[in-house]
Amino acid sequence: MEAMRPLWFQTALLPEGWTAQVRISGAAGRISSIERGVPPGAQDERHAIALPGLPNLHSHAFQRGLAGLTERRAGGPDSFWSWRELMYRFIEHMDADEFEALCAQAYVEMLEAGFTQVGEFHYLHHERGGTPYADPGELAGRVAAAAAHTGIGLTLLPVFYAHGNFGGAAPQPRQRRFLSDPAGFARILEASRRAVRSVPGAGVGIAPHSLRAVTPPELAAVLALGAGGPVHIHIAEQLREVEECLGWSQRRPIEWLLENAAVDERWCLVHATHASTAELQGIAQRAAVVGLCPMTEASLGDGIFPAVAFAEYRGRFGIGSDSNVRVDAAEELRLLEYSQRLAHRARNVLASAAGASTGRSLFEAALAGGAQALRPREEGVGLCSGAALDLVSLQQEDPSLAGASGDALLDAWIFCAGRTAIDCVWRAGVKLVQNGRHRERAAIQARYARVLRHLVSAAA
């Protein structure tokens, strides 16, 4: 890859803080140099405000197709569990081409919203009816194709899913597209690694779905396949899950995991909504990341993660769009803070210190935690030499940013403007979004609309 045209910004958020008149040069998808306090050059591409791109550490991209389709109350109590049945029905008719179309639409929206990398928690492995594809990586390849088409950075997280509940309970018939045994999962994982080779900079981790879906021996077998990469798991999302885990093991889910697995900085514990104080301390001590998905957790009525207590233990977190019911990086951060305000009846509760900007505190924590969760061995986070050239520019003309400078820009973006203030987005040095619109949006959106009309009709 040839050297790109230098980018010049009136102000940029660098690791040391806000810096004026910054030129960023890149080569081979990475930042090759950063010059501070320099006037724009004749060859520079000029912009106003630069931020690092945020990692999206947890996504089920195909669920973008469900957005807006589950907002009708069920006959009985409506919850995560009733929503899950609707999701199972939705995927019964979905083929590989349709799956890829849904993924591509979600990835376009992520890039337009300021996410430049995604951790795809990928558990749909088999054909309709549950028959394995001839290529066990068929649908992993469709995730990779959607990422390559849109340009988003990809960490693919193939999911091991074998059971319907704790203790090796039999799976439900509607879960058959997810299922494998350890040997079958090893084939899926190897095929997934082959599938992402054509995606620049892509990585692969592993994802035991949840303690509900794996037995202890299966968990050990799956972890042995991880090759030192990231490990993601759903955990303690629902109170019912906690109660059933206590009935099975006399331990809470996170408590059991910390006692029975070598949880470390490679791990991302997704949701962890109903963590106890001792569990929060344990996660922080192991330097694992908690993957928070505030919009999905609110949509599903999961509960509110105890973020204030976790922060007191210096816990690490990142954010994810999960079900992709709405894709907006700023709104995930805003809802995280606002949910804590409601719970604690206080303001600016996640600001890192007295006088600190809440927006900056949230942004930098999510940047560091997301980077660790997706690339735990990679050095260089944010806009620094050697890091991936993943960058977002904000529009100086957005009314919500008028008169703002420094950390007030982040506060205005997160708590007011959201994705409407995003101008351009670069991933690995390639400009994918300009004037707030992805360069492939028209074709991808048209394909998505055709697919969704068919799927909605088929699921009716």
Functional labels for PLM-detected ranges:
Residues Q10, G29, H47, H58, ...:
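Divalent metal-coordination and catalytic microenvironments
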